[in-house]
Amino acid sequence: PTNNRWKEYYRVIANANNILKLIDPSSEDPANLKYRAIALGFRGYAYLQLSYLYQHSYYTGADGTKWGRGEKYDFSQSPCVPLITEDTEGDQPRATVAQIYEQIKSDLTTAFDLFKGLNMTRTSSATDMDGCVVAMHLARANMVIHEWDEAIKYAQVVIDNFPILQSEDQILQGFSNISLPDVVFGSDITADNSTTYMSFFSQMDTYGDGYAGIGVWRAAFKPLVDRIADTDIRLQWFCCDRSTGVTDASGNRITLIRDTQSPVAVEYQAVKFIGTGRDNIKAGVFSGWELGDYIYLRSEEAYMIKMEALAHKGSAEAVTELNSFMKTRQPDYNYTFTNKADLIEEIIYQKRVEFWGEGLEYIDNRRLNIPVDRTDETWGAENNNHFSAGKFRYNQEDRPFLYQLPLSEIENNSQLSPSDQN
């Protein structure tokens, strides 16, 4: 329900506002500066998340791409969500998208500057809200509003502080350990805080006893995987004939779940996320799937934001950045520039593979005007492994992408009426 997301992010905003009310903004006390930075960082993040859901993107589309501009394109003056800060009194109407982004940038840039002044650009713990976490969200926000130089600036902060995953062991670990070198922000999951069957790994881990392991299979879109090169390590995230196919004693081809002798439940079944970690699976240990750490931000995103922003600017450096990144996934990768639109499409495709199952495609589709197209007419019935109800096409300016405002908000906020509903 859309009410869940609304409450989640406004709870973050309320907590941040309560902290900010207690701190004198002119205070130079390091403890006060730290807590002010943390509160502003979380508030900016929460408004950014709300902006993705309750209105169309600031701009739908960008010039020089295959997808172009949406029909309306500029939603900056459209109503978004109520803007509430520590100084706000009384009910508030829906602020415009532009007003929300002004607040996002103000909160996050102030937080970043405070963290930098406190030598907290990167702290020792991946669970900390710090300067790099804020920088990643600033990079995301600036991509939405086409501030390419600012996006590069803040992406570079993360790049300067974090490597990307390099080895096959790291890339295939299972994304369940916040000690991985690319983890910018995450949560340490233990027996005390695991939600077990309500957890991320219950939903995504093929090897566990959660939903994804006992019948609610997670599979990737066939055309997405079929485009991955044989030499790309990431192909091994998906079980298909090219990655885990074998010939049985009868001469029949079967696809196995990676690192096991068990056949897949469905072709293209995903094994990217492994709660207990791949080393345990290879050793025959399948327990502990519910203890996988949550990884919220990975450094690879900053590298890909930078290369995309460079491409939008028409910089040849974008190809250099893309090739450098991709050689860690596919050693024989070598992209040759033809035109800007194709380059941006290639970057977005590789980003979609890299972050499969991590939620970034939704954000990128919104800001780049990429339709969600799962129809047989486009892909061919033989290539479309979506179930029938999932075979649809929507453009980014279509209503299904707009979350509804909770009825409780409309009923209890004196500045809203039913006519304010999306």
Label every PLM stretch briefly.
Residues 101, 148, 315-316:
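TPR-repeat structural position
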Residues 1-56, 95, 113-115, 288-294, ...:
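Conserved, well-structured interaction surfaces
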